[in-house]
Amino acid sequence: MKSCGVSLATAAAAAAAFGDEEKKMAAGKASGESEEASPSLTAEEREALGGLDSRLFGFVRFHEDGARTKALLGKAVRCYESLILKAEGKVESDFFCQLGHFNLLLEDYPKALSAYQRYYSLQSDYWKNAAFLYGLGLVYFHYNAFQWAIKAFQEVLYVDPSFCRAKEIHLRLGLMFKVNTDYESSLKHFQLALVDCNPCTLSNAEIQFHIAHLYETQRKYHSAKEAYEQLLQTENLSAQVKATVLQQLGWMHHTVDLLGDKATKESYAIQYLQKSLEADPNSGQSWYFLGRCYSSIGKVQDAFISYRQSIDKSEASADTWCSIGVLYQQQNQPMDALQAYICAVQLDHGHAAAWMDLGTLYESCNQPQDAIKCYLNATRSKSCSNTSALAARIKYLQAQLCNLPQGSLQNKTKLLPSIEEAWSLPIPAELTSRQGAMNTAQQNTSDNWSGGHAVSHPPVQQQAHSWCLTPQKLQHLEQLRANRNNLNPAQKLMLEQLESQFVLMQQHQMRPTGVAQVRSTGIPNGPTADSSLPTNSVSGQQPQLALTRVPSVSQPGVRPACPGQPLANGPFSAGHVPCSTSRTLGSTDTILIGNNHITGSGSNGNVPYLQRNALTLPHNRTNLTSSAEEPWKNQLSNSTQGLHKGQSSHSAGPNGERPLSSTGPSQHLQAAGSGIQNQNGHPTLPSNSVTQGAALNHLSSHTATSGGQQGITLTKESKPSGNILTVPETSRHTGETPNSTASVEGLPNHVHQMTADAVCSPSHGDSKSPGLLSSDNPQLSALLMGKANNNVGTGTCDKVNNIHPAVHTKTDNSVASSPSSAISTATPSPKSTEQTTTNSVTSLNSPHSGLHTINGEGMEESQSPMKTDLLLVNHKPSPQIIPSMSVSIYPSSAEVLKACRNLGKNGLSNSSILLDKCPPPRPPSSPYPPLPKDKLNPPTPSIYLENKRDAFFPPLHQFCTNPNNPVTVIRGLAGALKLDLGLFSTKTLVEANNEHMVEVRTQLLQPADENWDPTGTKKIWHCESNRSHTTIAKYAQYQASSFQESLREENEKRSHHKDHSDSESTSSDNSGRRRKGPFKTIKFGTNIDLSDDKKWKLQLHELTKLPAFVRVVSAGNLLSHVGHTILGMNTVQLYMKVPGSRTPGHQENNNFCSVNINIGPGDCEWFVVPEGYWGVLNDFCEKNNLNFLMGSWWPNLEDLYEANVPVYRFIQRPGDLVWINAGTVHWVQAIGWCNNIAWNVGPLTACQYKLAVERYEWNKLQSVKSIVPMVHLSWNMARNIKVSDPKLFEMIKYCLLRTLKQCQTLREALIAAGKEIIWHGRTKEEPAHYCSICEVEVFDLLFVTNESNSRKTYIVHCQDCARKTSGNLENFVVLEQYKMEDLMQVYDQFTLAPPLPSASS
């Protein structure tokens, strides 16, 4: 049985405490208090409640047989609230956690958030409670606060990798990363969800659909097509999934040119869509797509019928009406086209395509004034992709108008009503009222998805009236309209009659009887239905994900409707979500997500992780405009009125008058951090998907919601003093908040305030650029040695964080201080630990054996108490628990293992996290106080070498590794050492191994200090860098031809610009052209492996001339002790460049140092940021929806300047060596044609080891593989190295201690469970092992599938992934790589060595 976070014993204890509190209250009443009788819980009810927490979310069926459970939860909430009120909030923190769980299960999200907030504020070690973090993540997910939800879910998996709802977490992480366009992370989490055999609210087929759709989103159409077709072969595939898969395949064949010729594609598209409609006849989306297909092959009547069906099924769709308008315009029916376009823009005031088409229609009818108004509205839309072309057209029309005689337009008869008149035409006017009515009808609908759609039910059938048109009459009407210009008088009369009847019929259909016209939640302090706060808007229905793809074929920018997809605790607005303000990006795609606006530039990233008791706006996160600021203040000040925002559709005028603001990027802050949304209403996100609405349509499964729309309410029991609304975060911050953008009462702030103990944090601004370093220069030598001696060993690295992991009371936000304290902190003595034991016992909660039953039915498979559980989760906590941290570093291994056995007997599981619980790692905040602006461009530390003696001068090593120097440039190294750089020239490389593989990155040629989007209109952080492969010979040919082409261009410029100097001409011309775009495409040859000493013997031998501290292999290099090859780290890699080739921003793998030598002949420009600021850059990446660890990003220097981030900037010339210190962030661009060689180095320092371990833990939190196996490396260091630095020794020894305990405890658990452990010793140079599923390092005990073991392929799993795949491990064998006696011997023999008499190079 798996650990599921907080122990049920804790819940039972809370319930028992609740009983004690009740007795006290009863005694108070008996003594004379006159109070109303408060509800009380029986012992049986308290026991039942002990098994209810966030882990049951989505698995409790209130609408089936769970009425008793729902009633019990409601009663418990009333009892808890009553008790807390009477105790004036002075109750145990667990009460608030339980109250949060109960409200979450009842889907009362505002109350759940409020209760979780109080628990968070009261419980200093809240991070140990996985169920709390999970519940908090679910609430954030519900409110579309994706960045918060991601952090909460990641921390659950970090503190408890075996969490029983890990599959639910991976599913939601996959969805959120997909929306954030982090496709690699999304795919990884979907795959992790797929391999988990635990129950989930989505079926595996639905998860496979998400993976297929992810490929489609990435424009990997062949992979997507293959995945969809494979999914159709699944047995017992539900009709909902089948219909959606067929819909996707149909639309892909219509839109993707790669799938065949047009005729074949359209034929397949129509077949797939027809099959989809057979599976789900009520899909308005499929009808719309079918109409588009018919339209593209000229079947006008079929297209009209399909569009009509689409409108009937999915009600208002701006895309459908726009497509109808296009058809009418093609049929030369301008009046009908006008009405259709007006319907489209009333449904979606920002529908750029409809505005442009409408403008074209007016222009064709010679009404330029109306055309200008339409074009202006199109340019105001964020989805408008050709603003410049429209602006030019507007100028042209305005110039024409100026040249016309005055009054000529007024005297001219208009073919069409003006835009203002058209706004009130009968059909559009009725449409808007109809839409409001239909939305209300859907809110009152029962929990009926009708195949996955929230479909409105038709009105009750009434007696047929004379205006009711039969299908025959409707067909006749269409025929008459199609031939309007060729009708005789009788036919024209018939057409008028039929059209009038048609309008009457529409009016009747648009007013369903008994349906309210106003959408409202009726919830106190909650938003209305049109509020920008993303909440559930359909009583009894699941929230939906409405992801809509923008079609890009015949009408760029015309988009489909928005079907929805329900998901347990989906963060998306429920019910049918009209695309009322959806946007397009030219012919690209758009994702609509409920009512929440998420853009690719990171608006969702602006959602802060709020700080407790803070009163100011998020730092560097959100800029409020006045239009958004006021509603927020009003909401906080008015306890009975929610933040109301109009839907901005028909309430807006035709010329862009808006209730709030016509187009500006103002944002509304949601109550209690529910998300930041664009004021235009429905959001968009650039995406590459096709039909994302259909993509996530139908995929609902097993959960039902119960309440309607809800805002965030401050209940009495949840209000902090002063009525300040605080929202919990899973990272706690302390300190004041500098640089807050504004101050609005009630909105917590998110500022990382770093406290004192950050190790290796350089004091910026102090670095000076020394002159020539030479052992013959006594003055300089003294300066250098003084600097080194003052800073190395006795500087910031001397500080060691003594926070006790198990009794953690307050921690700063630096990763250095908390995340890796399990390895990288000094361990307190047993005596000091014992003094804190009483505080730590309650926090070391024993995981429970399983979830209690609900209504007599077990929620998980219970295990017989006679059977020994692998994870030892059946033990109850005992008052005699020995804190794991009381095991000192210094006792022998035998004492350690004896203590481990006691730990097991006392009820601790074998989970490393429970043995050594540490707070999840967090990025450091920006160093405080911030540097003054004149210190943000510091000089780069540079050393000039004259001879070999200078290169081997000992202080050079000390200077480079000094944490105060994030980077050092060693000038003239090649000349001083007489290195033959020609061995690495392109010519020599081709002669040596011309067919050697080269990884190619295709990039855009840009100015070094700028990064523009492909159109050249705005600066962005995302750096285009697409991967492919070639050979050295082919890249050499490209490199040479690029140089020749540049020479030709230079000669042409000289002949055309003789009036100016060459330099002025080139710089000004390039600067202007590059900013305008489109940019020239270049290719960068990167990561060329030079590890083979047979192929590259001469080259590698030449590098042995280097000083020991920068060599690829040396005794003082940690990476030389890994024991196997890590390509590019302890081997050499080569880079072949043309001007503009970019290495995007990054820190080295596991924060190791790096060495880079420029071979030449051209230069490179470097940009460097000190390690202490990586948290700031991580925040910028989050804002821009980029993955700091794995993404491709190029920082905007203006952003860094505003955030007070210092940037070292320098030129690396041929022969210069650049030393990047541990953890330094850097990015590089080639100025000329050049080659570079590089590798990593690990100095034997406490600072390097500490930063490496911190990144190891951060990678684990982020589900990213650590390239350096730190556990494996630490044991090899203990075998090979004598360590004299006490801080480094303690960190390594503690890592050994921790892993020794893990191995012993796991061994004992496996043996007790009857699982055989098979000896499988390590071979020479065998690589360290990683889990094939989650990619964490696996040490000593390898879980290998039976099949791979028999085949000798050895596919390794970690314990947690093995158990998720096979609960009882019956499909796995366990291989042991080290004898416990060997590990004990290494541990005992690793002792602190006496200090060396003097430092050496």
From Swiss-Prot:
Record-annotated residues binding Zn(2+)?
C1331, C1334, C1358, C1361
Q: Which cofactor does it need?
A: L-ascorbate; Fe(2+)
Which InterPro entries does this chain map to? Corepressor-Demethylase (IPR051630), JmjC_dom (IPR003347), KDM6_GATAL_sf (IPR046941), KDM6A_B-like_C-hel (IPR048562), KDM6A_B-like_GATAL (IPR048560), TPR-like_helical_dom_sf (IPR011990), TPR_rpt (IPR019734)
PTM Phosphoserine: list the residues.
S769, S829
**Keywords, alphabetical:** Chromatin regulator, Dioxygenase, Intellectual disability, Iron, Metal-binding, Methylation, Nucleus, Oxidoreductase, Phosphoprotein, Repeat, TPR repeat, Zinc
Where does each TPR repeat begin and end?
93-126, 130-163, 170-199, 205-238, 250-283, 284-317, 318-351, 352-385
EC number(s) for this protein? 1.14.11.68
* Annotated spans, Interaction with SUPT6H: 1-1095
- Residue numbers carrying Phosphothreonine: T827
Stretch list, region Disordered:
437-457, 521-541, 624-746, 758-778, 810-864, 914-940, 1043-1079
Question: Known Gene3D superfamilies for this protein?
Answer: 1.20.58.1370, 2.10.110.20, Cupin (2.60.120.650), Tetratricopeptide repeat domain (1.25.40.10)
Tell me where in or outside the cell this protein is found.
Nucleus
Reported effect of changing R922K?
Answer: In a patient with chronic myelomonocytic leukemia
Biased-composition ranges, Basic and acidic residues, are 1046-1063
Query: Where is this chain compositionally biased, Pro residues type?
Result: 918-931
State the reactions this protein catalyses.
N(6),N(6),N(6)-trimethyl-L-lysyl(27)-[histone H3] + 2 2-oxoglutarate + 2 O2 = N(6)-methyl-L-lysyl(27)-[histone H3] + 2 formaldehyde + 2 succinate + 2 CO2
Boundaries of each JmjC domain copy? 1095-1258
Sites bearing Omega-N-methylarginine, chain numbering: R519, R549
Q: Where does Fe cation bind?
A: H1146, E1148, H1226
Task: Write down the SMART domains for this protein, in alphabetical order.
Answer: JmjC, TPR
An example of a GO molecular function for this protein is:
chromatin DNA binding
Write out the biased-composition intervals (Low complexity): 814-833
Describe the subunit structure: Interacts with TLE1. Component of the MLL2/3 complex (also named ASCOM complex), at least composed of KMT2D/MLL2 or KMT2C/MLL3, ASH2L, RBBP5, WDR5, NCOA6, DPY30, KDM6A (or KDM6B), PAXIP1/PTIP, PAGR1 and alpha- and beta-tubulin. Interacts with SUPT6H. Interacts with SMARCA4. Interacts with PROSER1.
* Disorder noted: Kabuki syndrome 2: A congenital intellectual disability syndrome with additional features, including postnatal dwarfism, a peculiar facies characterized by long palpebral fissures with eversion of the lateral third of the lower eyelids, a broad and depressed nasal tip, large prominent earlobes, a cleft or high-arched palate, scoliosis, short fifth finger, persistence of fingerpads, radiographic abnormalities of the vertebrae, hands, and hip joints, and recurrent otitis media in infancy.
What else the UniProt entry mentions is: Escapes X chromosome inactivation.
Q: What is this protein called?
A: Lysine-specific demethylase 6A
Q: Which organism is it from?
A: Homo sapiens (Human)
